């Protein structure tokens, strides 16, 4: 629930944002200089978390207000929808077998993760589902903020999984070449078109789609309307070829700072000993999920004769940009890898809100 719009509340929100974003930007730039993957997401999360945890006087002032967070989510949903294009159905027909295998692996990985977290570790269903679902870390963190109290736990699970993928995939593929992929990933992020390089019509279309989608989604009672609404609208318009919205560099960085900073602020207010058990569970869950995808890729490669490494990169949930760039470095079919990752993420984010809504309101 948003704070009342009093002068004091507005001042408090702006103060929190300034402190949080100053730390987030500084930490993000350091991570970028060090060549880490997703530097502004990891930098903002860990920077705000560590500094907030160490410096008690600013701890209570950290955070990102909801009135700022929601517009960022609206724009993020629009950009996610832009991953689908008019050629989506052609790809689906030519890659039918691998798509079916990827969908099956996603279901199996999710069920295996749920079994471990619910039956063995006794997690609540919603927290367990959000923690083990093999989707994009930033988007799941966005969703979790509205659904669970411990969204920082969800963030930990996904950060651990992505870190394991990015550290292990290069070793599996070609020993020590992973750093090349990290550098290429960061170069791709920097090469995204700037907001100042785009025509006003494109920016207007981006803003209009993001804004219009929210009331429409609320009117037709979509779950999580601020994310699902623009995601569906953007997907449909991109598939029909009516619009083409690129990933806007400044907005992608802003989304990373907002999401990472918000989660880092919450982590800073939780004692580390309370997090230790979740970190252990996150490693176990990540191994279960990644092993499921790896075994599926191995079985399909044995059956069809397709390249195991290419299938592994196409299936394994380790970040669209990072894994796609690993495919580029090692000479695999980039479209194949990117398509399967995009489809998996879209599958998760179209299905997840409805699954949660159904389990919360079974009637």
What feature does the model see in each segment?
Residues 112-123, 165-186, 298-304, 347-363:
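Juxtamembrane and boundary regions of transmembrane helices in multi-pass small-molecule transporters
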Residues 1-22, 129, 153, 177-200, ...:
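Intrinsically disordered, low-complexity non-transmembrane regions of multi-pass membrane transporters
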Residues 135-140, 154-177, 292, 320-322, ...:
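Membrane-embedded alpha-helical segments of transport systems
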Residues 2-67, 75-87, 196-271, 291-298:
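Structural signature of multi-pass alpha-helical membrane transport proteins
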Residues 120-160, 308-340:
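Alpha-helical membrane segments and immediately flanking helix-loop junctions
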Residues 70-81, 105-106, 132-141, 162-168, ...:
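Small-residue-rich segments of transmembrane alpha-helices in multi-pass membrane proteins
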């Amino acid at each position: 629930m948003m704070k009342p719009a009093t002068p004091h509340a507005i001042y408090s929100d702006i103060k929190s944002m300034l402190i949080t974003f100053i730390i987030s930007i500084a930490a993000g730039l350091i991570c970028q200089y060090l060549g880490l993957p997703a530097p502004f997401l990891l930098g903002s999360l860990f920077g705000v978390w560590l500094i907030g945890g160490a410096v008690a006087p600013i701890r209570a002032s950290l955070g990102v207000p909801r009135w700022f967070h929601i517009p960022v989510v609206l724009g993020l949903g629009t950009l996610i929808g832009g991953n689908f294009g008019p050629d989506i159905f052609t790809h689906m027909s030519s890659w039918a077998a691998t798509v079916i295998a990827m969908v099956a692996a996603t279901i199996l990985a999710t069920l295996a993760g749920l079994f471990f977290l619910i039956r063995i570790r006794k997690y609540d269903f919603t927290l367990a589902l959000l923690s083990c679902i093999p989707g994009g870390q930033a988007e799941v963190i966005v969703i979790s903020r509205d659904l669970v109290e411990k969204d920082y736990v969800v963030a930990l699970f996904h950060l651990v999984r992505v870190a394991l993928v990015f550290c292990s995939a290069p070793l599996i593929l070609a020993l020590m070449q992973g750093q090349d992929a990290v550098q290429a990933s960061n170069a791709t992020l920097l090469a995204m078109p700037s907001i100042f390089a785009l025509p006003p019509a494109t920016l207007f279309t981006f803003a209009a789609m993001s804004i219009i989608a929210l009331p429409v989604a609320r009117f037709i009672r979509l779950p999580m309307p601020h994310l699902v609404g623009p995601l569906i609208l953007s997907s449909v318009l991109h598939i029909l070829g009516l619009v083409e919205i690129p990933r806007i560099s400044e907005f992608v960085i802003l989304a990373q700072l907002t999401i990472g900073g918000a989660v880092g602020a919450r982590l800073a207010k939780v004692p580390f000993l309370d997090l230790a058990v979740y970190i252990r569970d996150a490693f176990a869950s990540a191994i279960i999920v990644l092993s499921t995808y790896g075994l599926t890729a191995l079985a399909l490669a044995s059956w069809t004769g397709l390249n195991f490494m290419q299938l592994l990169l196409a299936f394994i949930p380790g970040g669209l940009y990072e894994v796609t760039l690993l495919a580029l470095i090692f000479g695999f079919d980039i479209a194949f890898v990117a398509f399967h990752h995009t489809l998996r993420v879209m599958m998760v984010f179209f299905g997840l809100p409805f699954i949660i809504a159904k389990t919360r309101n079974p009637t």
